[in-house]
Amino acid sequence: MAEGHGDAKGATAHTAADGGHKAPFPPFQKETFASQLVSLTIAFVALYLIVSKLALPRVGGVIEERQKTIDGDLAAAQKLKGESDDALKAYEAELAAARTRAQAIGAETREKLNAAAEAERKTLEERLSAKLADAEKTIAATRTAAMGNVRGIASEAAAAIVQQLAGVQPDSKALDSAVNASIKG
């Protein structure tokens, strides 16, 4: 039986030497380091050439285009800011002019209203003065008429009293002169 399975010593020796592996991992083999370094150098040079000739110019172009866009946007924003500042100054100037016009219109209207009120006041004073003069004339006429009636009534009353007391008809001139003296005071 031992013959069919082989030599036990040989199997143990073979297994112990290989450790269960056939060969070491290729990158760790010392014999292939030089060829691996050459392959790595060729790969990095090729990658550098591809990146520097194709990718970097595209990225640089994108960056330049983006910078141009940013610069253009900043210039447009500065221009619009200047325009808005100019518009604000024009608005403020127009607003100041409108205030001045409004104040002038207010002053003019105030002057017109004051002049109209003064004219109306003068007209009213003239009408009131005319009415007062007419009223004074009416009062004077009424007083004169009343005084005339008072003289007549006083003369008649005095004549009646003298006739009643003295039994004699008094002289009308003497009676009028006595009544006038009595009225004057």
Swiss-Prot record:
Entry similarity comment: Belongs to the ATPase B chain family.
Q: Which gene encodes it?
A: atpF2
The record's disulfide annotation reads: none
- Protein known as: ATP synthase subunit b 2
Which keywords appear in this protein's UniProt record, sorted alphabetically?
ATP synthesis, Cell inner membrane, Cell membrane, CF(0), Hydrogen ion transport, Ion transport, Membrane, Transmembrane, Transmembrane helix, Transport
Q: How is the protein disposed in the membrane? A: Single-pass membrane protein
What are the GO MF terms of this UniProt record? proton-transporting ATP synthase activity, rotational mechanism; proton-transporting ATPase activity, rotational mechanism
Q: What is its main location?
A: membrane
Quaternary assembly = F-type ATPases have 2 components, F(1) - the catalytic core - and F(0) - the membrane proton channel. F(1) has five subunits: alpha(3), beta(3), gamma(1), delta(1), epsilon(1). F(0) has three main subunits: a(1), b(2) and c(10-14). The alpha and beta chains form an alternating ring which encloses part of the gamma chain. F(1) is attached to F(0) by a central stalk formed by the gamma and epsilon chains, while a peripheral stalk is formed by the delta and b chains.
Compositionally biased, Low complexity: which spans?
9-18
The GO cellular component terms are: plasma membrane; proton-transporting ATP synthase complex
Which PANTHER family does the entry link to?
Answer: ATP SYNTHASE SUBUNIT B, ATP SYNTHASE SUBUNIT B', CHLOROPLASTIC
Cellular localisation: Cell inner membrane
Summarizing the function annotation, the protein's role is: F(1)F(0) ATP synthase produces ATP from ADP in the presence of a proton or sodium gradient. F-type ATPases consist of two structural domains, F(1) containing the extramembraneous catalytic core and F(0) containing the membrane proton channel, linked together by a central stalk and a peripheral stalk. During catalysis, ATP synthesis in the catalytic domain of F(1) is coupled via a rotary mechanism of the central stalk subunits to proton translocation.
List where the protein spans the membrane.
Answer: 32-51
- The species is Rhodopseudomonas palustris (strain HaA2)
Which InterPro entries does the annotation name? ATP_synth_b/b'su_bac/chlpt, ATP_synthase_B_chain
**Region Disordered, residue ranges:** 1-23
